[in-house]
A protein has these predicted regions:
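Generic secondary-structure signature for well-ordered alpha-helical cores
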Residues: 33-38, 47, 92-96, 114-118, ...
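Short, mixed-charge aromatic SLiMs
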Residues: 19-23, 50-51, 132-136, 244-261
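Conformational coupling and interaction surfaces
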Residues: 1-9, 152-155, 159, 163-293
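Active-site histidine-anchored catalytic micro-motif
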Residues: 1-30, 64, 70-173, 179, ...
Length: 293
């Protein structure tokens, strides 16, 4: 997205998720320096979920949080603003024009909405990698929360996800059930490895790290699908459905419960758009075009 001519990345707010806030913030800076965009403002956001301690991620991304690629230490400084305030200020400066892409727990956005409730009327839309909605056989096979039903971003801060989903903000959720159905093939990995572009080489290294740990390349693609849904909305077919977030379940904390019933549906649940299916070939083409160009 930062390199796309179709969009303008106005800022990044880090948040505690797979790793503590200091590591995630540093990794944002490293990534922006890697792609030659150190000018994009980075603000450090929430260091813990709204009401819970930050859980340890059972799916390790290596000691650096990026698949053991060990990018150089960043020289760019973070913004003086808090990550929550950066969201508020950017949206306020561009009412009706800003899409907020969330590829981490929704803590920052939830805090922004609590601080400035009017924000829900000013954001163009939210597109998030969040949940799993039971729409194919992969729905819970690749669950990333610390239980068989939850996706990590919602599991980490289910209260934040519930607040955002219930806020009335225009929202598209890309679930794991749709996002985990595609991988890079050998030819694509070869192109990345042999590219003259450093960022392409880095993506290939990330995939190789995952393969050594017994995982597939979709693990580095799922967040990209949320970005691709903004760059090219026709890539992903959405369906509107009522969705609830489990915040109290002993075995199902963080589960996103989609109510598809025609009769006796839970009318109190918010209606949101969730991914039904994707054009995976086109998604990979868009991804490769953006990495290799």
């Amino acid at each position: 997205g930062a390199k796309s001519s179709k969009t303008e990345l106005l800022g990044v707010s880090s948040v505690a998720g797979n790793y503590p806030i200091e590591i995630t913030t540093k990794n944002v800076l490293k990534t922006l320096e890697l792609i030659g965009r150190p000018d994009i403002p980075v603000a450090k956001g929430m260091h813990k979920p709204l009401t819970r301690p930050l859980p340890n991620d059972p799916f390790s991304h290596g000691s650096d949080g990026m698949g053991e690629i060990f990018l150089p230490e960043p020289t760019t400084k973070i913004s003086n603003k808090h990550g929550v305030d950066q969201i508020i200020d950017v949206v306020r400066a561009n009412p009706g024009e800003v899409t907020v892409i969330c590829i981490a727990p929704l803590t920052n956005l939830a805090m922004a909405i609590m601080k400035e409730p009017q924000l829900v009327e000013e954001v163009k839309e939210v597109v998030c990698l969040a949940g799993s909605f039971g729409l194919n056989r992969y729905a819970f096979e690749n669950a990333t929360g610390d239980n068989p039903q939850a996706e990590w971003n919602v599991y980490v801060d289910p209260e934040a996800a519930k607040l955002v989903f219930n806020s009335g903000i225009p929202l598209r959720a890309i679930g794991l059930d749709v996002a985990t159905c595609t991988n890079l093939d050998k030819n694509q990995l070869y192109s990345l490895k042999n590219s003259s572009r450093k960022e392409a080489n880095i993506v290939e290294k990330m995939v190789r790290y995952l393969e050594r740990r017994g995982h597939e390349s979709y693990c580095v693609l799922i967040d990209s699908m949320a970005v691709a849904a903004v760059l090219e909305p026709s890539l992903i077919e959405m369906i509107e459905v009522r969705v609830g977030i489990e915040t109290k379940g002993e075995l199902t904390l963080g589960q996103t419960i989609a109510d598809f019933r025609k009769h006796h549906a839970w009318e109190h649940l918010p209606k949101i758009k969730v991914a039904l299916k994707a054009n995976y070939k086109r998604f990979i083409d868009v991804l490769m075009e953006n990495i290799l160009r």
